[in-house]
Amino acid sequence: MPKPFDLTLYLVTDPRLVAARGLLTTVDAAVKGGATIVQLRDPDAHGRALVEQARALKALLAPLGIPLIINDRVDVAVAADADGVHLGQDDMTPADARAVLGPQRILGLSVGNPAEYAASDLSGVDYLGVGPVKATGTKADAGGAIGAAGVGAVRALTRLPLVGIGGLATADVADVIRAGADGVAVVSSICAASDPEQAARALKAAVLAAR
């Protein structure tokens, strides 16, 4: 079994949005503001560069007890000793990923709607990322927005922990949590914020207030 993890405020990094401030500076500020789990997502980075980024983030986050998740790349997660991997629908199957990762690492899966959930291989999956809740500009291949109601529809089908993701701002958090999400995953609301620490603090407060 993976170690316990907290999905309250799930930060997904975007290399373009953190370029000016720096990846480590942005993530450090977000964690100080209350981010509870961090996913490294950089689809354009080559393997070696991604491993280096992951190791730097692991060194930052491990002493704080914050899990580091790697988007898509099981090999990078193993090489950097990250805490887990998040898979999309077109990535390696969860069963194959689990076979490589072993039982201790966290495994997440993206789900776009109830039909996609029903068709998914959930072997070894520990949590779901459900969305996009709203239209998003940070992921070109994201499907159509499903709204908080879509999150609720997936929640009705599963007991797995889940986060709502996709275009979420602080004002959207309450609806997503009340629909049954355990937390929210955000990209630009923190990565593009002028003050990532304060942005994270406001988002986390909104999650806790809606529970």
UniProtKB/Swiss-Prot annotation:
Its EC number is 2.5.1.3. Gene3D superfamilies: Aldolase class I. Keywords: Magnesium, Metal-binding, Thiamine biosynthesis, Transferase. Binds 1 Mg(2+) ion per subunit. One of its GO terms (biological process) is thiamine biosynthetic process. Pathway: Cofactor biosynthesis; thiamine diphosphate biosynthesis; thiamine phosphate from 4-amino-2-methyl-5-diphosphomethylpyrimidine and 4-methyl-5-(2-phosphoethyl)-thiazole: step 1/1. One of its GO terms (cellular component) is cytoplasm. The keyword Magnesium applies. This is Thiamine-phosphate synthase. It comes from Xanthobacter autotrophicus (strain ATCC BAA-1158 / Py2). The gene is thiE.
